[in-house]
Amino acid sequence: MTLISYDKENLELVSKIIVDNLTPDLIPKKWRKRNSIKGGSLMFGHCHTASACLQKIFGTKNIKLYRAKDHNDIWHWWCVDKDGKRIDLTSDQYYGYGRLPPYDQGEKASILGWGYKKRVQVLLERVEKVLDNI
C-alpha cells in the first residue's frame, strides 16, 4: 500500500512532517527519561517509529527497513529506498554527538509488533492529517 507517490519532493515533505510530529508519547517508556536529560538527543527512541511510518506512507516496494545495534548495544532503525538511498530521519541522535550510526552492520527488518506498531499508527494518523490539509 502506498499513500502518496514516492519522489524526491514528497520524500522531503513527508520526512519533515514525520520529524515535526515526533513527541515523547511515541517513545517507549524505557527511553523517555534518556531523552529528557539535559544534552540528550530528542531523536533517541524514535528511529523505529519514524522509519516504519515512512515505509507505511510510501509502501514496501519503495522503502525497506533496516536495523543494527549501535555502540550502546541498542537497535537503531533507518530506511533504504528502491534506489539504494539511505534515509535516516533520526540520525541526529548520532551525528549531533560526534558518533556514526551503525549502518555498516545493517540488516533488513520488518515493523515490530505490539506497542511499537501502535506508536507507528499514531504517528501515521498525525502525518495523514497534515497531508490532508495541504
PLM region spans:
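A structural boundary/capping signal
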Residues: 1-134
